[in-house]
Amino acid sequence: SLLALVCAGVLWAAYDWFQGRYLRAFSSHTAVFSGDPLRLPDEFAGPGPIRLVHFWDPACPCNVGNQQHLTELVEQYASRGVEFYSVQKPGSHGQLPSTLSRLKTITVLPGSEQIPASPAVAIWDRSGKLAYFGPYSEGLTCNSNNSFIEPILQALSEGRTVGATHTLAVGCYCPWQADVK
């Protein structure tokens, strides 16, 4: 009976640790995304291809659902001339899955320290102007059915102008900025 009690205690501790680390309630607060401070680094700025920058935090469980969607975006749009980049949350450690190995890393993107949450995406048009900044979608999950990104990329690919750099959204996001204590 003592062994059963010890086993139950160990199982409870493991469950409690797992729940605290990996299970989170759905975030129902509104995130306000503003692209005003964002600038591409000089080597990528200016006229050129459509550029999509993926902002991610390896410790954020919200990235898992969106990485499959991002893989599909790369498969669909890289052949159409869209270039894909990633910016990892400063001070974090991790790597994207192998399915996203085609994303080029941007170590420092001016203004990225001011973004509110991740996962997030910024898209620059062929003229080098920021066309979109915000989340991939609203809600708990992200896929091509509820994504904001496919319509933006389609419009830009067709030469249409897009100006959606300020977005309010409710979804699964993790804070980007360092906690101030």
Language-model features, listed with the residues they occupy:
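Thiol-/selenol-based redox modules, centered on thioredoxin-like
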Residues: 131, 136-181
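Short active-site neighborhood of thiol/selenol oxidoreductases, capturing the structured segment around
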Residues: 43-64, 69-70, 84, 153
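Intrinsically disordered, low-complexity terminal tails/loops enriched in metal-binding residues
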Residues: 27-44, 72-79, 174, 181
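Structural microenvironment flanking redox-active thiols in thiol-disulfide oxidoreductases
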Residues: 64-112
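Solvent-exposed coil/turn segments that connect beta secondary-structure elements
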Residues: 58, 89-91, 126-128, 135, ...
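Short, internal strand/loop/helix patches
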Residues: 97-135
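N-terminal targeting signals for export/organelle localization
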Residues: 1-37
